[in-house]
Structure formats: structure tokens, C-alpha cells
Amino acid sequence: MRIVDTHCHLDFDTFSEDLEKIIDRARNVGVTKMITISTKLSNFPSLLNIASKYDGVSCSIGVHPHEAGREGQTELSDILKYTSHPKVVGIGETGLDYYYDTSNSK
């Protein structure tokens, strides 16, 4: 069976020391593709670097709603200019996040 992990955060500090081993372990259990999801535009270069380094790894570009206040004003054009890169396969994180009940609906 082939598995696609459509939502991982390979750029998080938790994985930095063992990233290659983590990706190898995932491949050994059938994960053939991974999409590492952007939470901040400021971290996007790191995501793109990871996606470019590893076959089968792609990335998204976006700003998680909980990070939006810390990231400053983000224009759609700031995001769209990267979408033509072959390793960028989506836009996200985006939207409203009520999972942790910390997002202001207004």
C-alpha cells in the first residue's frame, strides 16, 4: 500500500536533528509522498529547502491563523508569487481555526 501524508510539519524544531531518519522511517512503512505545511511565511524558505532536498516531499505556503498576528500584514500576492515553484503544491495553512478555541471569530 502507498501512503501520502498530506499534512506534516517537517520544519518544526522537534524534527530538525533527525529529519533524514524520520523521512526514511516513513518511507519504510509505505509513505511515498509528504506535504509539509507552512504555518508562517517567515519559515517558508526552510520548507522549500526541505522539499527540494527530499524526493517525494512537497510543501505548501501560507500563514496559520494563530500566527497571523505575529507575521504582520500578509497580502495574497506575497503567497501567490511562490505557487509556480514545482515543489509548492498548495496554499495553507489558512482560514479560521476553532479547534483550540483560541481564534477570534471577528
State the predicted function of each range:
Residues 1-106:
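Mid-domain alpha/beta scaffold segments of enzyme catalytic cores
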